[in-house]
């Protein structure tokens, strides 16, 4: 016989054994019940037969799409890649049971390939499988309601209009429907009116503005039956910050650098160099961003139009700069300034542009800059004079001091020309007078030439100023006109 101490030890061990293994037995009983239920439901079940009591009755399938990720939008190939969860809900009368008979089991998770499923496919699929794989399990309730939510990655066809790239909006649709069953056999009903976006991960390039669903009953040319489909329209907008910072703003800077060419003085000799440098920088920039812009020949994107506009802008600036430099370096020996050029570019336009001559000088023929009284010497040794230069008087006072001293008062009232012609003087004095006359004529010719050259330079400056304002206006209004198109286009569509 066991002692009281031994009986207590045996009783404690029995309690510990019951506490440890009782849940295990309950689990085994539960597993056996679930296995018995599964065997009862699928022992004579045929997954290829529609779950209807009458063959004329349709299977009502409730359908909903939940998007988790907008993976990619390929503008070139016109493909939208999405990560979706497709929720199917229908009733199968052959998969019902009484929970009281199976230890209160109300739900059962069964492999999807064991049950009948509606063959819902994506009609406008571009790449990959049209139908989702049945590797996931379905949730089966005791009243026969089945909920099947398989995940799928679809690459759907989407006609895209990139006219306003990178400020474009796209409208891509996903069309789901039964591939073999018509409306008389499967009636699709949409759950809600929009795509479920509770688990959506934001995309760094695209924003989903709206995602609405619609049900359509369509009769195709191939068949007499009516087929039901559910179409979800995704209205997406491109986020333009990346393209604005890396594409548009550099182009704007290049355009305004082109405007500065016309503010650069022509005498510095670097106007064409600056134009060529801007053109080369734009060319290199275009080569870098070629991979960024969608390559399509259907339409010209907005950013492509702007790059083309900038290229034409820079090219025209080179042409205008060459023309301005040609005007700037003209001389009286090569070109004669027409009267209309003087009127327009020396009088009219400077007043309009609020320009004035850098030096306050009198406009004339240049004769005021030459000492009067000096002309070409006659052939007989007499001097022809048009004035009374003071240095000639001093010369005659030096060499004919005796004669002029006695008649100083009389000569002061007589013309210098008469004095020179009726006075006798030495050959040295004639050489000095001829030299002074030659220097004066050269000064006069140089001043006249310099004045004409200054006129041409001023005309070039006026032309530069005109094109400076023209290019500023074209640059501002051209840029505004191009980038206001998306706003006006979207307003018109709305």
Curated annotation (Swiss-Prot):
S-S bridge residues: 158-172, 222-223
Keyword entries, A-Z: Cell membrane, Disulfide bond, Glycoprotein, Ion channel, Ion transport, Ligand-gated ion channel, Membrane, Phosphoprotein, Receptor, Signal, Synapse, Transmembrane, Transmembrane helix, Transport
Catalytic reaction(s) noted: Ca(2+)(in) = Ca(2+)(out); K(+)(in) = K(+)(out); Na(+)(in) = Na(+)(out)
Extracellular side: 26-239
Taxonomy, superkingdom: Eukaryota
SUPFAM superfamilies, per database record: Neurotransmitter-gated ion-channel transmembrane pore, Nicotinic receptor ligand binding domain-like
Ranges per topology, Cytoplasmic: 328-465
One Gene Ontology cellular component annotation held by this UniProt entry: neuron projection
Signal peptide range in chain numbering: 1-25
Record entry for activity regulation: Activated by a myriad of ligands such as acetylcholine, cytisine and nicotine. CHRNA6 nAChR activity is inhibited by the antagonists alpha-conotoxin MII and PIA, a small disulfide-constrained peptides from cone snails.
Residue positions the entry lists as glycosylated: 54, 171
Membrane topology annotation: Multi-pass membrane protein
Lipid biosynthesis as UniProt keyword: no
Sequence similarity: Belongs to the ligand-gated ion channel (TC 1.A.9) family. Acetylcholine receptor (TC 1.A.9.1) subfamily. Alpha-6/CHRNA6 sub-subfamily.
Function text: Component of neuronal acetylcholine receptors (nAChRs) that function as pentameric, ligand-gated cation channels with high calcium permeability among other activities. nAChRs are excitatory neurotrasnmitter receptors formed by a collection of nAChR subunits known to mediate synaptic transmission in the nervous system and the neuromuscular junction. Each nAchR subunit confers differential attributes to channel properties, including activation, deactivation and desensitization kinetics, pH sensitivity, cation permeability, and binding to allosteric modulators.
Protein name: Neuronal acetylcholine receptor subunit alpha-6
Gene field: CHRNA6
């Amino acid at each position: 016989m066991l002692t009281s101490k031994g009986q207590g030890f045996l009783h404690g061990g029995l309690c510990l054994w019951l506490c440890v293994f009782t849940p295990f037995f309950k689990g085994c009983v539960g597993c056996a019940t679930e296995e018995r239920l599964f065997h009862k439901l699928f022992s004579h079940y045929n997954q290829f037969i529609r779950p209807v009591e009458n063959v004329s009755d349709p299977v009502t399938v409730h359908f909903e799409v939940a998007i988790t990720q907008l993976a990619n939008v390929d503008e070139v190939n016109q493909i939208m890649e999405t990560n979706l969860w497709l929720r199917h809900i229908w009733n199968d009368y052959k998969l019902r049971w009484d929970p009281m008979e199976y230890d209160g089991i109300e739900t059962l998770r069964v492999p999807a390939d064991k049950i009948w499923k509606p063959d819902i496919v994506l009609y406008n699929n571009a790449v990959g499988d049209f139908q989702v794989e049945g590797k996931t399990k379905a949730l089966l309730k005791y009243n026969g309601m089945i909920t099947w939510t398989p995940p799928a990655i679809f690459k759907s066809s989407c006609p895209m209009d990139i006219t306003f790239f990178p400020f474009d909006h796209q409208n891509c649709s996903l069309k789901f429907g039964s591939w073999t069953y018509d409306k008389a056999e499967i009636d699709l009903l949409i759950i809600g009116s929009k795509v479920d976006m509770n688990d959506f991960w934001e995309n760094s390039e695209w924003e989903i503005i709206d995602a609405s669903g619609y049900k359509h009953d369509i009769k195709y040319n191939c068949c007499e039956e009516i087929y039901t489909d559910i179409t979800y329209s995704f209205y997406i907008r491109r986020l333009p910050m990346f393209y604005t910072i890396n594409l548009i703003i550099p182009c704007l800077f290049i355009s305004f650098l082109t405007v500065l060419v016309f503010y650069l003085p022509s005498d510095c000799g670097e106007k064409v160099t600056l134009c060529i440098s801007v053109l080369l920088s734009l060319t290199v920039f275009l080569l870098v961003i070629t991979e960024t812009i969608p390559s399509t020949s259907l339409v010209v994107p907005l950013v492509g139009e702007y790059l083309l506009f900038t290229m034409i802008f820079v090219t025209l600036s080179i042409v205008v700069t060459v023309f301005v430099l040609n005007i700037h370096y003209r001389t009286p020996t090569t070109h004669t300034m027409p009267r209309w050029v003087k009127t327009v570019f020396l009088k009219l336009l400077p007043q309009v542009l609020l320009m004035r001559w850098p030096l306050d000088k009198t406009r004339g023929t240049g004769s005021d800059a030459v000492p009067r009284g000096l002309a070409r010497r006659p052939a007989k040794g007499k001097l022809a004079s048009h004035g009374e230069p003071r240095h000639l008087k001093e010369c005659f006072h030096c060499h004919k001091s005796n004669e002029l001293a006695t008649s100083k008062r009389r000569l002061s009232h007589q013309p210098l020309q008469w004095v020179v012609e009726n006075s006798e003087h030495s050959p040295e004095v004639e050489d000095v007078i001829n030299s002074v006359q030659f220097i004066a004529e050269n000064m006069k010719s140089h001043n006249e030439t310099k004045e004409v050259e200054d006129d041409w330079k001023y005309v070039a400056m006026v032309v530069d100023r005109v094109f400076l304002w023209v290019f500023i206006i074209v640059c501002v209004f051209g840029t505004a006109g191009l980038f206001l198109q998306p706003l006006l286009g979207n307003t018109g569509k709305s």
